[in-house]
UniProtKB/Swiss-Prot annotation:
Pathway: Amino-acid biosynthesis; L-lysine biosynthesis via DAP pathway; LL-2,6-diaminopimelate from (S)-tetrahydrodipicolinate (succinylase route): step 1/3
This enzyme's EC code(s): 2.3.1.117
Protein name: 2,3,4,5-tetrahydropyridine-2,6-dicarboxylate N-succinyltransferase
S-S bonds: none
Record-listed substrate binding positions: 111, 148
Source organism of the structure: Rhizobium rhizogenes (strain K84 / ATCC BAA-868) (Agrobacterium radiobacter)
Underlying gene: dapD
Keywords: Acyltransferase, Amino-acid biosynthesis, Cytoplasm, Diaminopimelate biosynthesis, Lysine biosynthesis, Repeat, Transferase
Family: Belongs to the transferase hexapeptide repeat family.
InterPro entries for this protein: DapD_Trfase_Hexpep_rpt_fam, Hexapep, Hexapep_transf_CS, THP_succinylTrfase_dom1, THP_succinylTrfase_N_sf, Trans_hexapeptide_repeat, Trimer_LpxA-like_sf
Length: 285
């Protein structure tokens, strides 16, 4: 699609979103066509909700988020086949894999093991591996990335190349509660088991989060080497573990106030870290 066509599509989505109270399951014509086109572009990876520039800054394509939201007003509830034991689900969003056969899977080039759930408009790049996991609509999963068992990739989240999302990891979405920007995990990151990254936070390239690290916009991220406290973004090649900051205050009963949770940057990634968190290429052959 040309830049001119994309601009026209964006304008159509923006206009429909401004008039969203009048958009419903009976809506036909330009609005429905524009939303369907936007979702198909997301599904194929030809467009993304957010894109990283050469300067490292991310640009959010808000109009694509709006297209995802409009789809909920346009689509009625329907039976979704494929449940265990021949059961069905009841939803507005079909499976990405609906109607796929062997040729389509081979063309897509990723692995999806039984009980991997991907909603339509999410993109999965070649050589990615989906264990029994959940990838929500509008998300982007990069080449060679592993989404391990019971990990969840939230709506419109951006996962880079050669990332490992360990078992039970949660990557937050943007649709509810509504966030300005998607949660982003850049290339070559390792996210430890049961960790959560939410609220549009960014984990920069090559970083490693230990098991059970929780990062939201209000989470203090403490650099142990400098004492600097930041929010919302982990610097490149950081090794981060769960920690606690002393409160320093005294409660009314005279006892020390409880320490508060924080994420601690304990060091930068080194060869020892890489040897423990490296991607196993044998799994991607």
């Amino acid at each position: 699609m040309s830049a001119t066509d994309l601009a026209s599509l964006e304008n159509a989505i923006e206009a429909a979103f401004e008039n969203r109270d009048n958009v419903n399951v009976s809506t036909r014509g330009e609005v429905r066509d524009a939303v369907e086109t936007a979702l198909n572009l997301l599904d194929s990876g030809k467009v993304r909700v957010a894109e990283r520039g050469s300067d490292g800054n991310w640009t959010v394509n808000q109009w694509l988020k709006k297209a995802v939201l409009l789809s909920f007003r346009l689509n009625d509830m329907q039976i979704v086949d494929g449940g265990p034991g021949g059961s069905t689900w009841w939803d507005k969003v079909p499976s990405k894999f609906e109607g796929w056969g062997e040729n389509r899977f081979r063309e897509a080039g990723f692995r999806a093991v039984p009980n991997a759930v991907v909603r339509r408009s999410a993109y999965i790049a070649p050589n990615a591996i989906l264990m029994p996991s959940f990838v929500n609509l509008g998300a982007y999963v990069g080449e060679g990335t592993m989404v391990d068992t019971w990990a969840t990739v939230g709506s419109c989240a951006q996962i880079g190349k050669h990332v490992h999302l360990s078992g039970g990891v949660g990557i937050g979405g943007v649709l509810e509660p509504m966030q300005a920007g998607p949660t982003i995990i850049e290339d070559n990151c390792f996210i430890g088991a049961r960790s959560e990254v939410v609220e549009g936070c960014i984990i920069r390239e090559g970083s490693v989060l230990g098991m059970g690290v929780f990062i939201g916009k209000s989470t203090k991220i403490v650099d142990r080497a400098t004492g600097e406290i930041t929010y919302g973004e982990v610097p490149p090649y950081s090794v981060v573990v769960a920690g606690a900051l002393p409160n320093g205050n005294t409660m009314a009963n005279g006892q020390p106030a409880p320490s508060l949770y924080c994420a601690v940057i304990v060091k930068r990634v080194d060869e020892k870290t890489r040897s423990k968190t490296g991607i196993n290429e044998l799994l991607r052959d």
